[in-house]
Structures are given as structure tokens and as C-alpha cells.
């Protein structure tokens, strides 16, 4: 799948040169991190993180896999999601998560449920079609506040 979007300021203007640090679990729901003690398999072909930069239009695009859900506590299963930390001089650093549309587990996610309806909508990507090769594209725009 592909994730594409733009980094914008609060007025809708593009933020070029924003550093986007992203990380996620693999398709089995396991992070490539020493503190993830899951018994799910690691994928030697999947790094699980990247640092990219928004272009002159604020745009970004990357290819990844759909992360797997994973248990996070007593009766709590995290839905598939990606983590983003976005930073640009002159703006307040944003750390957030991107969720996928139409995921049943979104309704029960303890972190997502803490957010207002408008915040939840901003955190859920939208379907943006498929590539010529049949790969799903999701759209996720990120808004930074000026410092």
C-alpha cells in the first residue's frame, strides 16, 4: 500500500521541508524494537520505520505494509495504525497516529476514543484509490501549528 498526503499549516499552506519520522508494526503486529516481546514473527524484509521530508508542496508519499493489530493490555487490541512525529523549525512538533478507515477495532481503541470526533476524523486516513498495479492508496494530511 501507499500512504500519501501533505504537511500543512493551520491556514492550509504547504509546509515544505518538514521532517516526518514514522514507525509501525509489521503485518503480524510486531515492532522491530527490543522492548516488543511479542511472540509474533519478525519480518527480515521489513524495517518498520523511515524518516522522510515533505517536498515543496508539503507532499509526501511512501510504500509500506498494512500493520497488524496487536494486544496492548487486558482486553485491549490496538487496531492497525502508523506513528508519525513531524517537525519543522518554526512549528510545534507533532506526534500522532494514523488509523485506517473502516477498521472495526478503531471503535474500541482506548487512545483514539480519548479524542474528540473532529480529532478522530483527522487521525483516520481516507481511501484514495488504487495504483495501476492494484495497490491501495491512503491519504493522510498533517497540520502543524506555528510556534
Which residues make up each language-model segment?
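Beta-strand-dominated extracellular/periplasmic modules and repeats
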Residues: 1-147
Amino acid at each position: 500500500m501507499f500512504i500519501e498526503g501533505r504537511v500543512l499549516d493551520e491556514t492550509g499552506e504547504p509546509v515544505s521541508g518538514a521532517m516526518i519520522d514514522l514507525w509501525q508494526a509489521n503485518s503480524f503486529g510486531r515492532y522491530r524494537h527490543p522492548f516488543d516481546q511479542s511472540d509474533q514473527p519478525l519480518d527480515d524484509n521489513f524495517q518498520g520505520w523511515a524518516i522522510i521530508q515533505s517536498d515543496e508542496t508539503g507532499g509526501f508519499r511512501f510504500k509500506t505494509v498494512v500493520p497488524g493489530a496487536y494486544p496492548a493490555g487486558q482486553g485491549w487490541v490496538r487496531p492497525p495504525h502508523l506513528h508519525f512525529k513531524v517537525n519543522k523549525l518554526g512549528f510545534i512538533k507533532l506526534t500522532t497516529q494514523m488509523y485506517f478507515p473502516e477498521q472495526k477495532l478503531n471503535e474500541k481503541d482506548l487512545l483514539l476514543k480519548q479524542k474528540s470526533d473532529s480529532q478522530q476524523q483527522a487521525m483516520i486516513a481516507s481511501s484514495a484509490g488504487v495504483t495501476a498495479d492494484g495497490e491501495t492508496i491512503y491519504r493522510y494530511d498533517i497540520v502543524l501549528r506555528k510556534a
